[in-house]
Each structure stands twice: as C-alpha cells, then as structure tokens.
C-alpha cells in the first residue's frame, strides 16, 4: 500500500507522523511523509521518503483566528494536491491539526484517515469542554456545570464548522465534511476518558514515538535518584522550566543526596550547568530507563513516553492542551501538577513524588494499559479494504 502521511512541523505532530511512517515501512508499505522543511532530513535519515508540505508560511492577517486556520487549510489543500496526485497514494493519513491533508485527499478522491497524536479531543455530550482539565461532573450540580460549560463553548464550535464549510465550498468540495474513514487515537488508554458518544470511527492505537537522535546523554555519577527535565517543544509551553530546575534542585539541599539532573531538549539558549547535571539532546527512550522522575510541560508526547516507561511525573503545564493532559495525569495518580512553577512549589512536588511509591505504581499501571490498543497499520489496511 502506498500511503501519504501529512503533518505540520511541530514536533508533537511531526514526530508521531514519522513514527507511523516507520510502522508502515516495517509492515511492507510505502509511506511518504509531507511535513515542514526542518524535519525532511531527519525523516530521510530514518529511512522514510519525505517531501516539504507546501503553504506552511502564513500569508493572511485575518483577525479571526478560527477563520484564518480554516482558510489556510483550504489554501494548503490546493497547493499540495498536485504533489499528492503525482504520488498517487492508496491512502492519505492527515494529522488532526493539519486539515489540509484530508481536504487534499477529498479533492483527489483518495480515502483518508486522521491521526490524533493525543487523546480524542472532539466535544462530547458526557464531558466538560476539552481543555478545562475538569473531570466529568457528578450529581445534579456537576452535570449542570458541565452542561452550562458545553453551552458556552458550543457557539465557537458551531462557528468553526461554518467557517470550515465556507472554505470547503470555495475550493470545490461539498459544504458538509464527511470526515475521515478512521481516527487513529495515538494515546495510552489510561490517558483517555470514557464518553457516552465515542465515535465509531475512532480507534485507540497507542502512542507513536520517534527519537530524532540515537545519541545517549551521559548521566553524571551519583548514588541518588535521576531527575529528568524535558521542557515543552510547543510554542505554548512554560518558559524557563530548565532554568528553574537547574537553579533550585540541588542534591543534599532540595533533592536527596547523590541526585542527578538531566535536561533533555531539542535546543535552546546556553545554560549554566552544575556538576550534578547534564543538558543536551539525547535519546529519551534510553534516558527513561534510568529515570526516577520526569519534570515536563505536559505535552502528550513526553507524558505518554514517560508513563510507558513506568516513570512518575511532575507536570508544569503551559497553554494549549497541556492543562488538560496535566489534570489527567493527576487524576490517574501518576504525578503532581504545579502552576505557577515557583521554585518552592517545584521542590515540594519533586520531593513528594520521589518519596511516595504510589506515583510510580500508578505510572506502571498506565504503562500496562497499552495491552488493549489496536495496531494502527492494521486499522488503516482494514479501513481501506472496506472502501472496496
């Protein structure tokens, strides 16, 4: 099967797309990744054919962010349709926030599937609005709270649907969006929440992780716990997390004696690194085999990767979906949430998680939930076969 996988350049979306391409290739399929120019060489080094996704640079200044997103997706669909036509894939897999891939597939009459590299974020009649971080309300007052919040957000959701319909018509598609054949929900079941209206096309397939390097960070010597700090790669992530951790987490003072600190990041400004710490880009999968605790911003990729390794968390969420993810971690029991990230709050949360076995036990329970997921490649093959 020849498949085109479309994702924007944000690592939280491009890396899962590369991971899915590798899964396709391992199964004997022929994947081609369309993504930002900054990850083309990385994908090719991993053995994946890759091409630049056209139209990623914004060209309008519409003050309505929602309208701008939909208009940009439609423009990108038209720009990228010729490259997809030349590739002639049997299937297109489009990242959930890169709607252009699905629209381009529709323009060409190619079946398409959506990749959600996080839990399902569609609104539900049984949940508070996604992003609130709230658990479903219980009792009359709790259900009333959720209903009121859903009503307050429904107007924006309906406006988005109207904007999407308008730009679809502009590029020659029907106003009504038929949606994807399947939605690949690439998360751990432990991070999902039950809903009464789970879509029939949505399938849990487990996290999709890709390591952009095979370099191994050398952990400083010591007999105490290893604390990993993984600052967010998202534009909405909390700033200064690494700096606060390096300045205030000190072995024998605010950490157990012999502790080590490892800051794992793709890049950033130079930092003053004490002798008990190391900073750089290294394989997080390898690093997590040594970790006793991870401090991160709450992006789904790092949270899921950490839980898969059975390691507990201290989450310092920024914007976007990080608040939602952080609260799900807390409710699942595998970590603590702090906001704002004051030095005192960070030190207290780190020491509580390190000293209490229940956090690691919950993380291991989350890791075990992977046993119930489906194979994303098989899901794609079976969905395509049903189209005849």
For the regions a protein language model found, what residue spans apply to each?
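Nucleotide-activated sugar donor-binding and catalytic core shared by glycosyltransferases
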Residues: 1-9, 15-32, 42-47, 86, ...
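Conserved nucleotide-sugar phosphate-binding/catalytic loop shared by glycosyltransferases and other
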Residues: 32-69
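Generic beta-sheet signal
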Residues: 34, 53, 115-116, 186, ...
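Short, polar loop motifs at secondary-structure junctions
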Residues: 35-40, 96-100, 188-192, 263-270
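Short gly/pro/ser/thr-enriched loop/turn and capping motifs at secondary-structure boundaries
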Residues: 39-41, 57-60, 119-125, 129, ...
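Conserved nucleotide-sugar donor-interacting segment of glycosyltransferase catalytic cores
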Residues: 71-143, 190-192
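Long, low-complexity segments enriched in small/aliphatic residues
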Residues: 157-207
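Conserved catalytic-core segment of nucleotide-activated headgroup transferases in glycan assembly
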Residues: 194-269
